[in-house]
């Protein structure tokens, strides 16, 4: 009976979403506050209904209710509890319900924290959110019902794909969806503003926190997905330019551009049309990613094998929402007034360059991802666009972007001093070149671009720190005064610096592991020794083991350095009982920021086994940098001036330019300190 209650709750959520999408819009047209006020209440009710529905499905998984088809297809009574729970979203139907839950969650957050929004704008934003929720609720109920019953109920389930039985699955999809779906709020704000014909600095101020939150979650989701693929799939790589990986990366690139564009709009009321377009594009790319994963057009470890009719349904949603939003944009954009004028050399100019490069990079990834699909649809020819294309084109685009990033915070709004900014960045650039030279000579030449890329990473990190040092006046005033000035800076300044530092750390990791990792493929018998990097690995033999729902053959390796044993590594091949599906579990040991990675291959007729061993220098910088970027997003969100629904006093503080906090403006600092 409880399963039917979950299904009925989903139907009621659909009805509530329809009410939320219709009546508040009528209220706006009629100027009726009571109808407009329905939007917030309906959003909260819709969230509670979908949350109840999701809880029911989770209960069915935990109790192994195999009368539910979705549970039977993706669970097993022997599966550990954590994987029973994560199995809820380890399949198409359950993950779509999670998608819908997060969508209505964001609607509820707008309803709760958007109290200071203009009543008409809030009603329109929640109405657009409801239109999206209505479409996906119909999609779930009509094509992807997670509550379908099996009669009679099977005695045992088929189990979840063993590759997905990993703790990473508990974290990766929810984070990814929080990023994907979080951009729906930006989309709804853009559509609502176009409907009202009013877009100004206040609009950008309202959009920025939602953009920042979605960007932070998406950064976390992509990083977690990359690390999961690295350690779980046993292939030794961290990014494959898989079409589904690209489908999450494109909204991240566009969302990064939107963050910077919204800042220009907030400060100078410039780039209005462009910012609205980016808000629409970012969520459109999220919807495109949903289509690619669930339409059946891709074969990927990330994709769900689905009925093509589901792809047609999602394609219809794409056409309606993306086509409708762009049509509205084309009709209303010409009515938007142009914003402030600025010189090419200014902070606005640097952010425009940032936007141009990021959108070009997004278009490049989009072209490389969709071109094989379009070509196959038109001609029947199958081609693949692989890593060499993306590495070359995307890498070349990132070089000028990274060179420009440290200049942005050092340039003034409206008109900046390029020579002055370059002079202030001289030390960062010099130390970056020094790091590149040291790297080049340390590896006895080698690829020139690798030391150059490492030097760029160092330059980016030091450039971000330079901005904070200059704002505090460190070295020009007493240490106590510099500390007070530094602590008086807005948290968003620290968030920006952390995000740029994180990008630099990630760049160092990418360049180092790409250029200098070593791979050894060798047949080993017990007692065999192989040298990898600075370490020696001795194969000690295989041992059989058993887990809760699998058996495994685990290989034991002893790691030595300079003849001294330092650690051991276990790498295994598992066979899961229910599906009889083998998996490879890599053995990984960390040394500082570098890792030894061991993966077992095929058994040989002479009693040996093929072993693949990688030495991956500084690979943890890739995900460590992502963590720092995420921390930057969280710190920026904690800035009271950027909180949704911030009080008027805090909103007024936004009028203070970040340049007011530099060391040459002590009066402003003193005023802020006096206010506490």
Curated annotation (Swiss-Prot):
It is found in: Cell inner membrane. GO terms for biological process: cytochrome complex assembly. Keywords: Cell inner membrane, Cell membrane, Cytochrome c-type biogenesis, Membrane, Transmembrane, Transmembrane helix. Pfam families: CcmF_C, Cytochrom_C_asm. It is a multi-pass membrane protein. One of its GO terms (cellular component) is plasma membrane. InterPro entries: CcmF_C, Cyt_c_assembly, Cyt_c_biogenesis, Cyt_c_biogenesis_CcmF. The keyword Transferase does not apply. The chain crosses the membrane at residues 8-28, 42-62, 94-114, 123-143, 175-195, 210-230, 233-253, 273-293, 311-331, 356-376, 393-413, 418-438, 445-465, 493-513, 617-637. GO terms for molecular function: heme binding; heme transmembrane transporter activity. Signal peptide: none annotated. Required for the biogenesis of c-type cytochromes. Possible subunit of a heme lyase. Belongs to the CcmF/CycK/Ccl1/NrfE/CcsA family. PANTHER family: CYTOCHROME C ASSEMBLY PROTEIN-RELATED, CYTOCHROME C-TYPE BIOGENESIS PROTEIN CCMF. This is Cytochrome c-type biogenesis protein CycK. It comes from Rhizobium meliloti (strain 1021).
């Amino acid at each position: 009976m409880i399963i039917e209650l979950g299904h009925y709750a989903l139907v009621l959520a659909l009805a509530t979403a329809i009410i939320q999408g219709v009546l508040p819009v009528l209220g706006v047209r009629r100027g009726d506050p009571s109808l407009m006020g329905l939007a917030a209440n309906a959003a909260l009710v819709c969230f509670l209904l979908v949350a109840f529905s999701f809880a029911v499905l989770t209960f069915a998984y935990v109790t192994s209710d195999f009368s539910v088809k979705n549970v039977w297809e993706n669970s097993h009574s022997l599966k550990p509890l954590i994987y029973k729970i994560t199995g809820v979203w380890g399949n198409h139907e359950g993950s779509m319900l999670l998608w819908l839950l997060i969508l209505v969650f964001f609607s509820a957050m707008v309803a709760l924290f958007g109290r200071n929004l203009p009543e008409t704008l809030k009603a329109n934003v929640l109405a657009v959110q409801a239109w999206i929720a209505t479409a996906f609720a119909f999609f779930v109920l009509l094509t992807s019902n997670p509550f379908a019953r099996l009669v009679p109920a099977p005695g045992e389930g088929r189990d979840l794909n063993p590759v997905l039985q990993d703790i990473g699955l508990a974290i990766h999809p929810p984070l990814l969806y929080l990023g994907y779906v979080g951009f729906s709020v930006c989309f709804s704000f853009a559509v609502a503003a176009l409907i009202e014909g009013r877009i100004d600095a206040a609009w950008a101020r309202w959009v920025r926190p939602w953009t920042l939150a979605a960007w932070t979650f998406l950064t976390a989701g992509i990083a977690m997905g990359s690390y999961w693929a690295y350690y779980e799939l046993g292939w030794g790589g961290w990014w494959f330019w898989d079409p589904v990986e690209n489908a999450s990366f494109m909204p991240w690139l566009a969302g990064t551009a939107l963050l910077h564009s919204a800042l220009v709009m907030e400060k100078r009321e410039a780039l209005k049309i462009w910012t609205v377009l980016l808000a629409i594009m970012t969520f459109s790319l999220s919807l495109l990613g949903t289509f690619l994963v669930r339409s059946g057009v891709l074969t990927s470890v990330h994709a769900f094998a689905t009925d093509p009719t589901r792809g047609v349904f999602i394609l219809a949603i794409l056409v309606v929402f993306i086509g409708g939003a762009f049509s509205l944009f084309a009709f209303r954009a010409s009515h938007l007034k142009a914003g402030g004028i600025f010189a090419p050399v200014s902070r606005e100019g640097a952010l425009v360059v940032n936007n141009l490069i990021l959108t070009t990079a997004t278009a490049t990834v989009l072209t490389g991802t969709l071109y094989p699909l379009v070509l196959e649809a038109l001609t029947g020819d199958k081609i693949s666009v692989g890593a060499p294309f993306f590495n070359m084109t995307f890498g070349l685009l990132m070089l000028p972007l990274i060179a420009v990033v440290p200049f942005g915070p050092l340039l003034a709004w409206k008109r900046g001093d390029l020579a002055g900014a370059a002079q202030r960045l001289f030390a960062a650039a010099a130390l970056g070149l020094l790091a590149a030279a040291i790297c080049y000579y340390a590896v006895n030449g080698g690829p020139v671009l690798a030391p150059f890329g490492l030097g760029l990473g160092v330059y980016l990190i030091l450039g971000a720190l330079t901005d904070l040092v200059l704002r505090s006046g460190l070295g020009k005033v007493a240490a106590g005064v510099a500390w007070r000035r530094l602590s008086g800076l807005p948290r968003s300044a620290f968030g920006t610096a952390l995000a740029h530092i994180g990008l630099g750390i990630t760049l160092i990791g990418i360049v180092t592991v790409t250029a200098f990792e070593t791979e050894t493929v060798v047949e080993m018998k017990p007692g065999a020794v192989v040298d990898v990097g600075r370490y020696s690995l001795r194969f000690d033999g295989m041992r059989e083991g058993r887990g809760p729902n699998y058996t495994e053959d685990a290989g034991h390796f002893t790691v030595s350095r300079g003849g001294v044993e330092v650690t051991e590594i276990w790498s295994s091949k598992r066979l899961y009982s229910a599906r009889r599906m083998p998996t490879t579990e890599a053995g990984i040991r960390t040394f500082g920021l570098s890792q030894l990675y061991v993966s077992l291959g095929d058994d040989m007729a002479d009693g040996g086994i093929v072993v693949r061993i990688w030495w991956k220098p500084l690979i943890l910088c890739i995900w460590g940098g992502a963590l720092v970027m995420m921390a930057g997003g969280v710190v920026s969100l904690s800035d009271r001036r950027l909180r949704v629904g911030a009080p008027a006093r805090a909103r007024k503080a936004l009028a203070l330019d970040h340049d007011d906090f530099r060391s040459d403006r002590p009066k402003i600092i003193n005023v802020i300190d006096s206010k506490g």
